[in-house]
Structures are given as structure tokens and as C-alpha cells.
Amino acid sequence: MDKGRCTILNSEELWAQARQLFAGGVNSPVRAAVKPFPFYVERGKGAYIYTVEGNKFIDYVLGYGPLILGHSPESVKRKIIEQLEKGWLFGTPSKLEIELAKKISSHIPSAQKIRFVNSGTEATMAAIRLARGYSKRSKILKFSGNYHGAHDYTLVEAGSAATEYNVTTSDGIPMEIMKTVEICEFNDLDCVDKKLRNEDIAAALLEPIMGNAGVILPEKGFLSGLRELTKSYNSLLIFDEVITGFRIDIGGAQSYYQIYPDITTLGKIIGGGFPIGAVAGKAEIIDNFTPAGRVFNAGTFNANPISMIAGIATIEELEKEYPYNIANKASKTLVEELERLLKIKHTINHIGSMFQVFFGIDKVRNYSDAKRANKEYYIKFHERLLKERVFIPPSQYETIFTSAAHEDDVVNDTIDKLAKVIGELS
């Protein structure tokens, strides 16, 4: 193929090629939810992404969460370039992994020790194996609509793109594995009590704030009750903070709610936009990973220098606090304006720099509620915003994110476009 020709193809032409090369035309299913075909992005800067055609979009997807500083922040880019000059993979430890681990441990209260991996999926997979190895129990309790990555142990009643494409329980997972996963609804402590009572649950695994069924918040007493129940029945508590870690608070949702798990999984923001995952927790638990213990985990790219330096540089910016002030203000303003503009039945779940709007329903407290929202209206809302060059997630079951690059001028421009779209839909 003529590489020069490829650079001038438009999105429709690229989509035609992609469908010949990839299952469904994409390499992660939610990307195909943009209709009639995905637009292809060439670059990003600040709050904006730019397509191969040169169209400029205000971006509220932000790579599905990692880009809390916006696209290509200079402070992070500079350090990545410096590291690229030195090398990007050595097959040995580097001092960068120590620096990033210290950063994480200084902010995440429960992170006494850490194992770096390459994605949120790898992190939850390793965390489940670790919990089983440590507890000598085989079952896991998860919550409907929580999404913990694309592996067998959690693709049961899963949210995110699994819900979008109606494969909440994936084909290809042996029944024997499914039988090791118990399910409760989010915010349902009675169910948790019943499931844990048999004392065969290694760990309860959840997103402390659901970010993969829209945004769904824990009700008062839910996380504290869950912590008490897991302790009472000698089960571990795993917080999947791949989305919420370093976004809700520099210490994650656990710091925000003051509820501390035994194990935390991290990803997204701690890699500054590069592939990363981490399993963090109490030293006595994490020390069960090889080579200290007998729970095997390994990876060629674990703690690769580029992800490490990008994470360090990102957290250094977050320590200055201004990113949270800007991102949270942007989110709050957008939610307030949406509430003012929307005249139809709806609810907006919002915390920090993440929110989602649900149409046709006045309360969403769990996955069952989220599925009752008017998905078709949300799709129209998304499509009309695309025409105005505003990019929100194409799926109802994802999160709208803001960043430190969403300054007042960006937000005000967005509000004008929201007013136009909502007026057209009314």
C-alpha cells in the first residue's frame, strides 16, 4: 500500500479498509458505535481532537478516561521525548518504576505494595488470581454492570461495550468459570450478605463508582457496609479504580469516601495515556505474587519506561491541584447547564470530572435502572452533538469526562452547542 496515499484518505475510505482487516472494522468494539462509521483522528491537543479530514472536535471522551490533563500536555510530552532518547524497553528494572510506585503509594492509602501490568484488564485478572491464591477460595462476587476488562473471570453481567453490543455474558467462557462468579446489584447490601454468608467468596470486586454503565454512585452506607461485610466473612475487598483512581481525587474514590479496600486495581491516568495497569494493596497480600510468592504474574512490557515516565509526569501535574479545579468546574458547569436546558424527563449522575445523562428516567442507582433509560434518545443526542463537533461517548453506558484543558472558553462553546442540539431535539 502507498503510505502517502493512506494519509489523505477520508474516514469513510479508511472505514472501508478497516472492515476488510478487523472484526467489525475496529480493535475495540465501542469505537464502532459512532454511526454511520467512526471518524479517524490524526492528532489531539488540549480539549480538541482533529480528524484526518481536518475537522476539529471538542473531546469529552478523552481516550475513555486517561487524559485528565487533556491531549498532548507539554509537561508530559517533554519527559516522554527525553526518555525516548534514552530507550523504551530494556528487559530489566528501571528507576522509573520505583518513582511511579512511590508516587502512587503516597496518594493511594491502601497501596503499600504494587505490581505493574499493561492494562486495566490485566490488573483485574491478576487481582482475582491474587485474591484466590491468598484466600484459598475460588469464587468472586461482582456487581451487575460493573466492567472489569475483557477476560473470562469478569465478562459476566458486564457493562461498557459488553452492554452496548448485548454480550454482557460473553460466548467462549466455560460454564465452570461462570460458576465461580456470583452476582449482586450495585447498592444492594442484602444480596451481598447472602452471597458472602457461605464463606466461599475470595473477594468482592467492584467499581466504587460505576463508570461503565453510565455513571452510578454508591448510596450512603453501601461502601462502608460492603467493607464491614467482607471483613466479617473473611473475604477480600477489591476496588477497581481503573477509572476513578487519580480522577475523583488524587487518592481515588477510596480517599474520597474514606473506605479502604484490601486490593486496588489501577490504570488509565497512572500511565498518562500510555498502556498501563497496576495491582496495589496490603504488603502481605501483594507479596503473594511471584517471585516472592506462588501467584504467578509476568509480562514483557510490565513497568515499561515510557508508561512509567508518562505516569510520573502526569501525577506531578495533578499534585499541583489546578487540574482538578479546572476539570471539576467544567463538569459542574456543564451539568448545571444541561439541567437548565433539558425539559424532558431525565437524570444526570455526576461526581468530580465525570458525569452521564440518562433520558426518560428520573433515577439511576444500579445497572437495571441504567438499562431502562431511553438509549435511542441518547444516540440522537450524541449524533446531533457530533454534527456540532462535540464528541461525547457514542454509548449510553460510558462516561462523559472533562479535563484540565476544558477551560471556560471551551465549556462556553460547548454550552452554546448543547443549547442548539437540545432545541432541535425538543
Swiss-Prot record:
Principal localisation: cytoplasm
Annotated SUPFAM superfamilies: PLP-dependent transferases
BP term (GO), one: protoporphyrinogen IX biosynthetic process
GO MF annotation, one: transaminase activity
Cofactor names: pyridoxal 5'-phosphate
Top-level division of the source organism's lineage: Archaea
Keyword vocabulary terms for this entry: Cytoplasm, Isomerase, Porphyrin biosynthesis, Pyridoxal phosphate
Catalyzed reactions: (S)-4-amino-5-oxopentanoate = 5-aminolevulinate
Cellular component GO terms held in the UniProt record: cytoplasm
Chain positions found as N6-(pyridoxal phosphate)lysine: K268
Pathway: Porphyrin-containing compound metabolism; protoporphyrin-IX biosynthesis; 5-aminolevulinate from L-glutamyl-tRNA(Glu): step 2/2
Subcellular location(s) per record: Cytoplasm
4Fe-4S recorded as keyword: no
InterPro entries referenced in this protein's UniProt entry, alphabetically: 4pyrrol_synth_GluAld_NH2Trfase (IPR004639), Aminotrans_3 (IPR005814), Aminotrans_3_PPA_site (IPR049704), PyrdxlP-dep_Trfase (IPR015424), PyrdxlP-dep_Trfase_major (IPR015421), PyrdxlP-dep_Trfase_small (IPR015422)
Catalytic activity, EC: 5.4.3.8
Family classification: Belongs to the class-III pyridoxal-phosphate-dependent aminotransferase family. HemL subfamily.
Record HAMAP family: HemL_aminotrans_3 (MF_00375)
Listed PANTHER family: GLUTAMATE-1-SEMIALDEHYDE 2,1-AMINOMUTASE, GLUTAMATE-1-SEMIALDEHYDE 2,1-AMINOMUTASE 1, CHLOROPLASTIC-RELATED
Protein name as catalogued: Glutamate-1-semialdehyde 2,1-aminomutase
Species the sequence originates in: Saccharolobus islandicus (strain L.S.2.15 / Lassen #1) (Sulfolobus islandicus)
Gene that specifies this protein: hemL
